[in-house]
Structures are given as C-alpha cells and as structure tokens.
Amino acid sequence: MTYIYRDTKITTKSTIPFLIFFLFCFSNLSMATLKHKPVNLVFYVYNLIIIFSSHSSTAELRRLLQPSKTDGTVSFLVIGDWGRRGSYNQSQVALQMGEIGEKLDIDFVISTGDNFYDNGLTSLHDPLFQDSFTNIYTAPSLQKPWYSVLGNHDYRGDVRAQLSPMLRALDNRWVCMRSFIVNAEIVDLFFVDTTPFVDKYFIQPNKHVYDWSGVLPRQTYLNNLLKELDVALRESVAKWKIVIGHHTIKSAGHHGNTIELEKHLLPILQANEVDLYVNGHDHCLEHISSVDSNIQFMTSGGGSKAWKGGDVNYVEPEEMRFYYDGQGFMSVHVSEAELRVVFYDVFGHVLHHWKKTYKEALYFAS
C-alpha cells in the first residue's frame, strides 16, 4: 500500500481526522495520572496539536512543552541504536532502563536515533514498530513520552511513516520529528536531524537507498535548520541547554568524529554556550570533554548491538573522560543547581558519572 503525505496544518478540512485521532490517543492516557496532575492534560493537548502538524518537508523547529516535577527538577533516560526485536541484549537493556527509570522517577526518554534496524520502517503497518518498541519497553516507568530523532538507518526506510503522528495510535509514547525543541522549564532540549549533513550518504550510498523526501533541496534544508537552531539557542532563557543528534561530533568509537558536524554544527553550539551534545551512531557509551568550550559530548549508542574493542583511538587524549564498548544507556538529572549524567551497563551497574553546577557553567561562560 502506498501512502501519500502532504504538509499538514490544522484546518477545517483536517479537523475531523484530528479529533478522531485525539480521542483515540486520549483514551489511552492514565485517568489516574490526569486526576493527580490535571496540568498534564494542557501540555498533552498542546503537544498533540504540534505533533499532528509537524511532519512537513521544512526544517522548521517545532516546540513541545514538557512539565517538570513539582520540585522543579527534570529526569530522563537516553538510549540509542536499539530497534532489533529484542536481540543483542536490547531486552536486557530495556529491563534495566525500567528499573533505573523507576528509581529516578523519570519524566521522559530520549532516543538518539537508529530506532529500527536495519532499514527503518517500511510503512505505518510495519510490525517492527511494535516488535522493537512497544513490546520491548514495557516497564511502568518507561510509559512516558519518547522524544526521538532519526538515524541513518531510519532514513533507509519510509521516513514519513516513522515521522507520522498516526503511529501514536499504536503507542502514544512515540514522538518523532526531524528537528524540534522540548521546553522543560529549567532545561531546553534541541533535537537536530543530523543525517542530511553527512556527505557520504548522498555521494557514496553504496547499496543503500535513502529516503530523502522532505530534505531536498539539501542545501536549503540544512541552511534553514542551522539558522533556526542558532536563533532558538540564542533566544533560550533556560538555565541549561542540551542538543541531541544521531551522529557524533567527537567520538573515539568506530565512526569517529563527524567532519560535517564539526564544520557546520559545532560552531553554533559553541557560540550559544550549549552544556551537552548527546548522540548515538557509535555503538558504545562515552564522555568526551572540550578544552576550548563548555560543551560535554556524550554518546549513548549501546541500546542493542555493540562493537567490541579496537575502536579507541582519539586524537585528543586529554579530552577523553570515559569509553565503554558494551551495551547500556545513560540518565540525566537536571535541577536549578546542577546537571548530572550517569552511564549504566546492561546489568544496571554504574560505569561513569559526571556533574556540573550552574555556578561552574556561569564561570566558564564569563
């Protein structure tokens, strides 16, 4: 079956399907949750409208709202490179995510891309969505929004299917757009579509076929994205700024640094005093600092298949803080006073932790 997608706006013509879609998704919400946290309904309705109108062909940065806890803090997990129907320890990582997520009382989960292997989703009806997502991440603590970006493997499938808000009829946790912003009060999270930056996917795709619908003309798409990101970062009034993309900027892993992102994206992050850049792509867990900026580079790409050994060869050893070539995930806890990151292995053991106080961030910025 072939699906035809058009840029969607909430108009009179689209009101009826939107209302049907909203009622379906709303019926899956926990009434107990809404009873105790009625403000969540406001956020839910607003976000649903934005998501429903988001799968356009532009690089426009849509904004979603994510409430913090009553104490003002925000906690979330980060996982990348995972969708393999539970194989390569994906199910075991999911189990530990559920346990850590409960301990931390997380507000949401972030996926750094390569959500469905090997070649994304084939359609809205691809069973891979439920086999690799819904039926794997079943813990109560993981029944929260999953804010997701696309990876290069996702671009080998039907991109519009994975971006479609209609997937929320199957699992209302799923939130996937090309590039977007989540405003979580004390922290702003900027999700960036990094795959179109990488030249080799266009010049030397080998046997792979990429779905570039909505991206071409490429240069216009990238210019618009970089411009909007720069403006959004500059205008952010949040205490903390975190940027999420699939591809590495700095990495000691198999893929190493992404030259195109070093050239085009990194200067914008440096100029706007971003605190973290979080990515997947390399199937490992790692933390790299920076000698010339405030940015910390965190890789969380150990959601399933990992690449063992032989990859650590970073050209700036003084920046290398942590590298682990196995499966796992990371957590982030944000408060007014500090930003805290923890890496976990497939057994839930803490491998590495790092924190920065807001005073330190101000000192470096000055």
Curated annotation (Swiss-Prot):
Binding positions (Fe cation): D81, D114, Y117, H283
Glycan-modified residues: N89
CDD domains tied to this protein: MPP_ACP5 (cd07378)
Active site, renumbered: H255 (proton donor)
Cofactor: Fe cation; Zn(2+)
Tissue specificity field: Expressed in stems, leaves, flowers and siliques.
Main location: secreted
InterPro entries associated with the record: Acid_PPase, Calcineurin-like_PHP_ApaH, Metallo-depent_PP-like, Metallophosphoesterase_PAP
Residue positions binding Zn(2+): D114, N152, H246, H281
Note on cofactor: Binds 1 Fe cation per subunit.
EC nos: 3.1.3.2
MF-aspect GO terms: acid phosphatase activity; metal ion binding
Keywords: Glycoprotein, Hydrolase, Iron, Metal-binding, Repeat, Secreted, Signal, Zinc
Compartments (UniProt record): Secreted
Domain of life: Eukaryota
Membrane spanning residue stretches: none
A Gene Ontology term for the protein's cellular component: extracellular region
Subunit structure of this chain's protein: Homodimer.
Name this protein carries in UniProt: Purple acid phosphatase 3
Lineage start: Eukaryota, Viridiplantae, Streptophyta, Embryophyta, Tracheophyta
Gene designation per UniProt: PAP3
